[in-house]
Amino acid sequence: CFNPMIVELAEKAMKEYGEDPKIETNKFAAICTHLEVCFMYSDFHFIDERSESIIVESGDPNALLKHRFEIIEGRDRTMAWTVVNSICNTTGVEKPKFLPDLYDYKENRFIEIGVTRREVHTYYLEKANKIKSEKTHIHIFSFTGEEMATKADYTLDEESRARIKTRLFTIRQEMASRGLWDSFRQSERGEETIEEKFEITGTMRRLADQSLPPNFSSLENFRAYVDGFEPNGCIEGKLSQMSKEVNARIEPFLKTTPRPLRLPDGPPCSQRSKFLLMDALKLSIEDPSHEGEGIPLYDAIKCMKTFFGWKEPNIVKPHEKGINPNYLLAWKQVLAELQDIENEEKIPKTKNMKKTSQLKWALGENMAPEKVDFEDCKDVSDLRQYDSDEPESRSLASWIQSEFNKACELTDSSWIELDEIGEDVAPIEHIASMRRNYFTAEVSHCRATEYIMKGVYMNTALLNASCAAMDDFQLIPMISKCRTKEGRRKTNLYGFIIKGRSHLRNDTDVVNFVSMEFSLTDPRLEPHKWEKYCVLEIGDMLLRTAVGQVSRPMFLYVRTNGTSKIKMKWGMEMRRCLLQSLQQIESMIEAESSVKEKDMTKEFFENKSETWPIGESPKGVEEGSIGKVCRTLLAKSVFNSLYASPQLEGFSAESRKLLLIAQALRDNLEPGTFDLGGLYEAVEECLINDPWVLLNASWFNSFLAHALK
């Protein structure tokens, strides 16, 4: 029921404050109404050559008339302040603190127009309290035909005001006929009142004076300077006001401005996670009920016994830099020592490996440079930190996208129980527990959830062993537990790790370990992925397929690796990823619910026909079911944990700035930038060799390409 020009102005005003007219419909209607009243207030009112105020409804082209009212409302902020400033300069009227709506050339005063769905008196007082200016005239209209103005001076004649009241009544009727009036009437918020300046005295005052920026003598002096800051002057001016050294040219950011991120060249990047992901193979027992069930070593031996295809191991993909026979000997030693355990009367709860030469080599025993007390060497003239090589650039390889896709998939087992995501501390309100249950149902079978539980188990076991058996080369089975579709419990063994010496004093002190993990993946298919591994062939496994049983070689992926107390602490807390992705989903539900003005949790999860945007790929925006969205968000969170690195930290922080600028452009907010080149540099210096960061950068490029089409 508003004309297109008013609608357009209102949309622009809301976008300027980052609000969406489609979501905040009541606010949108209020802005349209207010604009229309301001325009009607000024319509037909002129000042003639004798400076008399007259009303002219039909245009007489030869009359020398000047508009009686200057319209300030409806202009963008910069323009509006320019108009206000020029009026103040030419008329000498005091400059208002807030942008008024109109200026009256006859009475020489600014006017603040209010349109309220509440009591006119209430609203009038709020307005007066907010603007605190004797000089600005206030005029309030209501939808019920009441009005109130400063000193009961209504500025306009009866007829002009009646026109406005009639229009407001019409708007109310139109809204009521569409069932919108009640919600509109109830949604009005009071004016935010700005508190009086309160005095700061005593200690706080001294602290305030001490903490001023340089060149300011007192708090008053600084306040005056800040108050003189035009809130909507151009940024260049502000910067030069702040410092003489800064000179920034604001460049408009257009669809053609951004270029794609430059991904590094070089050999393809390699796998660097602490354990195998999509390539892992499990030896499993169902419904475990053996003696000592739950003791990792007992479980591991039981799992090992389910496999009968062991054979003499041999190296199929050597590690470029390592002494490969040592990896082979290490595996043989594990098999032999497990055999020894079984020959004992009573199986021990933990197993410490013999400190053989192959294990000492693999675990870097005695490799650390000797530490010397600083007192003994501070006189050495050329004392310096030894040079470390720049990391070698690596290019994006396709395996990391495959890893991510696999992490989003469903497995045939459930990896968490319903109450895994946080226990109810208080009687949680019904909606929250309902959301949690829906979400858990979508992600409990997800492969990313398996990675969480595997990571939690491995880090907990390793941290325990690091503290409990500092000097020992302890054998730690890599285990996880799940439930089958039929609800039967299952214990899985992925392989083993052997921990090195672990006198961890600081959070960042490193404990070395050797990991040995089962797999059916032939490393020769993507040798670049396995650069850091030595891979052995250790057996043949019979697999049931559609065409009957086939035999596949079983591989063992062996590598040396390291971690620290702080990394293990975070690894133990990987369940947080479930919470993080649940919160992201909740904010999507909240957005839907606020549009529909009711809780949309049930519809959100149960409307199977609806698709949601998941991410960008070179093909465009990918869409999927709500379950797929849950699993994708979870997988992202899990990969951020599995592939955590300084490169990821830097890339996330810096690329976010670029993302916000691109989104502002998408929302037609006309963003401007300075030193965009510097921002690109900051993002690109994080693109070195990390597979997850490189994948995110390539996704980012897809986003840029589509967002700015």
Swiss-Prot record:
It is found in: Host cytoplasm; Host nucleus. One of its GO terms (biological process) is cap snatching. Binds 2 manganese ions per subunit. One of its GO terms (cellular component) is host cell nucleus. Belongs to the influenza viruses PA family. The gene is PA. A motif (Nuclear localization signal 2 (NLS2)) lies at residues 177-240. Its main location: host cell. Phosphorylated on serines and threonines by host kinases, including human casein kinase II. Gene3D superfamilies: Influenza RNA-dependent RNA polymerase subunit PA, endonuclease domain (3.40.91.90). Pfam families: Flu_PA. Influenza RNA polymerase is composed of three subunits: PB1, PB2 and PA. Interacts (via C-terminus) with PB1 (via N-terminus). Its cofactor is Mn(2+). Plays an essential role in viral RNA transcription and replication by forming the heterotrimeric polymerase complex together with PB1 and PB2 subunits. The complex transcribes viral mRNAs by using a unique mechanism called cap-snatching. It consists in the hijacking and cleavage of host capped pre-mRNAs. These short capped RNAs are then used as primers for viral mRNAs. The PB2 subunit is responsible for the binding of the 5' cap of cellular pre-mRNAs which are subsequently cleaved after 10-13 nucleotides by the PA subunit that carries the endonuclease activity. Keywords: Cap snatching, Endonuclease, Eukaryotic host gene expression shutoff by virus, Eukaryotic host transcription shutoff by virus, Host cytoplasm, Host gene expression shutoff by virus, Host nucleus, Host-virus interaction, Hydrolase, Inhibition of host RNA polymerase II by virus, Manganese, Metal-binding, Nuclease, Phosphoprotein. A motif (Nuclear localization signal 1 (NLS1)) lies at residues 117-132. Mn(2+) 1 binds at H34, D101, E112, I113. The lineage of its organism: Viruses, Riboviria, Orthornavirae, Negarnaviricota, Polyploviricotina. InterPro entries: INFV_PA, PA/PA-X, PA/PA-X_sf. It is an enzyme of class 3 (hydrolase). One of its GO terms (molecular function) is metal ion binding. Its EC number is 3.1.-.-. This is Polymerase acidic protein. It comes from Influenza A virus (strain A/Teal/China/2978.1/2002 H5N1 genotype W). Mn(2+) 2 binds at E73, D101.
